[in-house]
């Protein structure tokens, strides 16, 4: 109804403005068109009033209205739950108050030079190995070592063992010339008796 009234007003305004530009005949035609529109509007208003009078009034209140409201509320609640499920969830499980993780660019990431990094050595407890001198001292001092496995007596062996100064040789630096002369002299001393023994039987045979 309101749209029709607005159209009627616009047409009247356009006709009123166009009357100044038209002649007498045109004004008569416009007046007839205006009367025709007024008749249509009056018929529409009458039909609208009769139709509104014929419609029964809605009944308000009662248990039926409450059930309709409850069904509408449930439908809205189910729609909200579905909308919440369809939303993209964040990593923390909540869309509100969560920080968006930022992926750094490859240019910002500093390449680590693993060549210059040296791994720390493992810490291993190494047992100290006893030297021969320590073993000799323990063998001479402690009588507990004189028995092996608690059954074998090693006293006879310890009595026959030679002292260290007789077994150990002095570390002397070798000179090639000096070593060659010593070896050659020893070889010659060994060869001289053999040569004399070989020569003596021949001489004895001649004398006989």
Curated annotation (Swiss-Prot):
Record localization: Cytoplasm, Cytoskeleton; Cell projection, Cilium
N-acetylmethionine PTM positions: 1
Statement: the UniProt record of this protein carries the keyword Cytoplasm: yes
Region annotation Disordered: where it falls in the sequence: 18-65
Compositional bias of kind Polar residues: 28-53
Keyword Phosphoprotein: yes
InterPro entries the UniProt entry points to: IFT43
Tissues expressing the protein: Expressed in the retina, predominantly in the photoreceptor outer segment.
Family statement: Belongs to the IFT43 family.
Protein name in the entry: Intraflagellar transport protein 43 homolog
The organism of origin for this protein: Homo sapiens
């Amino acid at each position: 109804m309101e749209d029709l009234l607005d159209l009627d007003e616009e047409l009247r305004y356009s006709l009123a403005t166009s009357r100044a530009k038209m002649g007498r005949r045109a004004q008569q035609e416009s007046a007839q068109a205006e009367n025709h529109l007024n008749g249509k509007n009056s018929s529409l208003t009458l039909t609208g009033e009769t139709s509104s009078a014929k419609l029964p009034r809605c009944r308000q209140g009662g248990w039926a209205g409450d059930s309709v409201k409850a069904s509408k509320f449930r439908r809205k609640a189910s729609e909200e739950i579905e909308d919440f499920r369809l939303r993209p969830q964040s990593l923390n499980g909540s869309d509100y108050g969560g920080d968006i993780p930022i992926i750094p660019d490859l240019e910002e990431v500093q390449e680590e030079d693993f060549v210059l990094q040296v791994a720390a050595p493992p810490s291993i407890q190494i047992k100290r190995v006893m030297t021969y001198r320590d073993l000799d001292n323990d063998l001479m001092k402690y009588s507990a070592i004189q028995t092996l496995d608690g059954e074998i007596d090693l006293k006879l062996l310890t009595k026959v063992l030679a002292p260290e100064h007789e077994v150990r040789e002095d570390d002397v630096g070798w000179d090639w010339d000096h070593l060659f002369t010593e070896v050659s002299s020893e070889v010659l001393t060994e060869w001289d008796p053999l040569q004399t023994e070989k020569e003596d039987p021949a001489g004895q045979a001649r004398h006989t």
